[in-house]
């Protein structure tokens, strides 16, 4: 007995300092965030849960922590906040994502943000920040995304930023910056888009020479090469020998110079690039233009063994570039039309400007007279659909925390497409197969922007319905009219895929006299109060029933028959974060009860899809607790 007591005392002495350290860390981070809350004006009570009496800020909405209860993410984008930032944010040593975009925050950017050495993404765009960009931000050695555009920042661009070798995306446009734009280090990768609309910036990338520097020489005019015959497998039906010879003569000097330069860089490769047709007036952002030959080699001649998937837009191939980087090459199938090259370049530019951690980032493109290809990073963990239904026995199933993270991440990506792209982008084919998973199983929305881009109108009528059966919103299928709410419907079905593990449309369910449409099948089980039967068997009982019910509630709100009644994706994000779901669900229940009482007839245009859009009794699920 005495020895047991001694062991207990020793363990207490060992563990108590660690516990004290954790409390101290949590208190510091909580105090810093509460200080931020005090200085911000919050008209929508977004920060209501930031209670200083709670030691651990990990319980607060819009705050994410790691397993050690350290804050790693603060998400307060598009929250209508005003006020200013506080230097105390510098104590969040493990913070990776600071998202404060699209608010009305004023004042300077605190130099203490340079202490956040684990920061990966700093998004302060679309605010009213003033003053200089802190030199201390150059210490953020892990930073990949730095977006300070659309503020009122002044002064010069700190040279220290060029030392951030990990920097992939930089946007300083639409400010009041002045002086020379650095062109060394990581800044050598960036194009005029990163610095646009800063009238007092100068340097080669801005096309405004700095005082005392020689004027820029305009580039020589580009001579369009004639079509060159290629192997018949790529659809060229012939070429005129004289034209080829003339084209070769005209372009002799350019390929020779390119070849000599290329040989100095890559002496072991056996192919070289020739100039491709390109409109010099179209800027393509921070994109690499690949040659067709380069992508042919990377994919082993677009071999069938390298096919990752097939879809309505074409096939996707796995490829390995000359430097060893794995990529996914999407080979688009489309009819060639007059002016199609310019349209393709314009759409590629729009896609490239949609940069968010939950969106699949376009790495480059290839355009020839016969081919259109897009190059993306390779996602080793595949898609949500493959992880749910096609995983090998050696791969563990997606657990419930991962599924929740996928739901929230994909919602954030779609919200960015709808609310922060100009023009906004409507996906039109949201489904589990188009939600990819990176190395950390973070959701990455793919295949966006491949349908026609939205203009500034609220809706767009297309000549062909894009999408997958089971995911298509009823109004889109019947009228061809799409909007953001079309994506919301598809997202709701994707949530049901996450919960059930099943396909959105599956004829195999007929064997059990079940509905082939996943939405109808789920509603049928809910009417029979068989919640446990719709849960993916791979989850077993390893999930929180309350959280499961809340995700189902969000899915049902997203799949309402009327697009006007569906929430926006930004509202979906807030509901998944725990903000506003109870009110939305209660409001929806009242509407459903009213429909039953007055026997409200459904829209006659939607009679055929009645089971998928109406008549779910309001008592199927308990409200949020």
Curated annotation (Swiss-Prot):
Activity control note: Inhibited by manganese.
Effect of substituting residue 468 to A/E: Loss of kinase activity. Loss of kinase activity
Instruction: Give expression by tissue.
Output: Expressed in flowers, tapetum, developing microspores, all cells of the embryo sac, provascular strands and developing vascular bundles. Low expression in adult vascular tissue. Detected in root meristem.
Q: Which UniProt keywords apply?
A: ATP-binding, Cell membrane, Disulfide bond, Endoplasmic reticulum, Glycoprotein, Kinase, Leucine-rich repeat, Membrane, Nucleotide-binding, Phosphoprotein, Receptor, Repeat, Serine/threonine-protein kinase, Signal, Transferase, Transmembrane, Transmembrane helix, Tyrosine-protein kinase
Phosphotyrosine: residues carrying this PTM: 456, 476, 543, 614
Q: What is the effect of changing residue 462 to A/E?
A: Decreased kinase activity. Loss of kinase activity
The family database entries (SUPFAM superfamilies) matched by this protein are listed as: L domain-like, Protein kinase-like (PK-like)
What ranges does the Cytoplasmic topological domain annotation cover?
260-625
Q: Which residues bind ATP?
A: 308-316, 330
Tell me where in this chain the PTM Phosphothreonine is found: 325, 337, 346, 402, 459, 462-463, 468, 479, 541, 559, 613
For membrane topology, the record states: Single-pass type I membrane protein
Binding positions (brassinolide): 61-62
Active-site residues, as the UniProt record annotates them: 429
Please describe the post-translational modifications of this protein: Glycosylated. Important for targeting to the plasma membrane. Intermolecular autophosphorylation. The catalytic activity of SERK1 depends on the presence of a phosphorylated Thr residue in SERK1. The phosphorylation is induced by brassinosteroids. Transphosphorylation by BRI1 occurs only on Ser-299 and Thr-462. Dephosphorylation of threonine residues by the kinase-associated protein phosphatase (KAPP) is involved in SERK1 endocytosis.
Per the UniProt entry, the Enzyme Commission number(s) are 2.7.10.1, 2.7.11.1
Classification via Pfam families: LRR_1, LRRNT_2, PK_Tyr_Ser-Thr
Give disulfide pairs as residue numbers. Answer: 58-65, 202-210
What outcome is documented for mutating residue 330 to E in this protein? Answer: Loss of kinase activity
**Which family does the entry's similarity section mention?**
Belongs to the protein kinase superfamily. Ser/Thr protein kinase family.
Q: Give the misc comment.
A: Seems to be related with early development of tissues in general rather than with embryogenesis.
Q: What is known of its domains?
A: The extracellular domain (26-234) is required for dimerization.
What is the name of the protein in this document?
Somatic embryogenesis receptor kinase 1
This protein's species is Arabidopsis thaliana
């Amino acid at each position: 007995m005495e020895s047991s007591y001694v062991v207990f005392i020793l363990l207490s002495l060992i563990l108590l300092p660690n516990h004290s350290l954790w409390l101290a860390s949590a208190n510091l981070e909580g105090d810093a965030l509460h200080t931020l809350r005090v200085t911000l004006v919050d008209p929508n009570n977004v920060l209501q849960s930031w209670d200083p009496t709670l030691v651990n800020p990990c319980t607060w909405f819009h705050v994410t922590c790691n397993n050690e209860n350290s804050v790693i993410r603060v998400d307060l984008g598009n929250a209508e906040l005003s006020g200013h930032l506080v230097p105390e944010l510098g104590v969040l040593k493990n913070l990776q994502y600071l998202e404060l975009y699209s608010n009305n925050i004023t004042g300077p950017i605190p130099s203490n943000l340079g202490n956040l050495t684990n920061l990966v993404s700093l998004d302060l765009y679309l605010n009213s920040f003033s003053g200089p960009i802190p030199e201390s931000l150059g210490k953020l050695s892990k930073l990949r995304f730095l977006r300070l555009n659309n503020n009122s920042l002044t002064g010069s661009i700190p040279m220290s930023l060029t030392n951030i070798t990990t920097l992939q995306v930089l946007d300083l446009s639409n400010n009041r910056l002045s002086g020379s734009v650095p062109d060394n280090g990581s800044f050598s990768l960036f194009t005029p888009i990163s610095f646009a609309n800063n009238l007092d910036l100068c340097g080669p990338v801005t096309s405004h020479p700095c005082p005392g520097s020689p004027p820029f020489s305009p580039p020589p005019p580009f001579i369009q090469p004639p079509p060159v015959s290629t192997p018949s497998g790529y659809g060229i039906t012939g070429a005129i020998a004289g034209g080829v010879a003339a084209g070769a003569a005209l372009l002799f000097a350019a390929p020779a110079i390119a070849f000599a330069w290329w040989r100095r860089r890559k002496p072991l490769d056996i192919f070289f690039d020739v100039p491709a047709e390109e409109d010099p007036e179209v800027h393509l952002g921070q994109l690499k233009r690949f040659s067709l030959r380069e992508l042919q080699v990377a994919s082993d001649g677009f071999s069938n063994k390298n096919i990752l998937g097939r879809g309505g837009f074409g096939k996707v191939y796995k490829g390995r570039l000359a430097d060893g980087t794995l990529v996914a090459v999407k080979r688009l199938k489309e009819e060639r039309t007059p002016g199609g090259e310019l349209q393709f370049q314009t759409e590629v530019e729009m896609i490239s400007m949609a940069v968010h951690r939950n969106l699949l980032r376009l790495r480059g493109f290839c355009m020839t007279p016969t081919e259109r290809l897009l190059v993306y990073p390779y996602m080793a963990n595949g898609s949500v659909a493959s992880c749910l239904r096609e995983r090998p026995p050696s791969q563990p199933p997606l657990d419930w925390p991962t599924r929740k993270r996928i739901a929230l991440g994909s919602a954030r990506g779609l919200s960015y497409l709808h609310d922060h792209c100009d023009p906004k982008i409507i996906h039109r084919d949201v489904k589990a197969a188009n939600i990819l998973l990176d190395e950390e199983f973070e959701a990455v929305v793919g295949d966006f922007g491949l349908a026609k881009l939205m203009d500034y109108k609220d809706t767009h009528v297309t000549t062909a319905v894009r999408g997958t059966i089971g995911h298509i919103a009823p109004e889109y299928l019947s009228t061809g009219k799409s909007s953001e709410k079309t994506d919301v419907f598809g997202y709701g079905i994707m949530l049901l895929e996450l919960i059930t593990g099943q396909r959105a449309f599956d004829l195999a369910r007929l064997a059990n006299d079940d509905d082939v449409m996943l939405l109808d099948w789920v509603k049928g089980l809910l009417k029979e109060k068989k919640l446990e039967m719709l849960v993916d068997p791979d989850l077993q009982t390893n999930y929180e029933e309350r959280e499961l019910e809340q995700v189902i509630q969000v899915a049902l709100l997203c799949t309402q028959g009327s697009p006007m009644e569906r929430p926006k994706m930004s509202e979906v994000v807030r509901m998944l974060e725990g903000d506003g779901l109870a009110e939305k669900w209660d409001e929806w229940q009242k509407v459903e009860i009213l429909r039953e009482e007055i026997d409200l007839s459904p829209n006659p245009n939607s009679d055929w899809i009645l089971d998928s859009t109406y008549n779910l009794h309001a008592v199927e699920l308990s409200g949020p607790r």
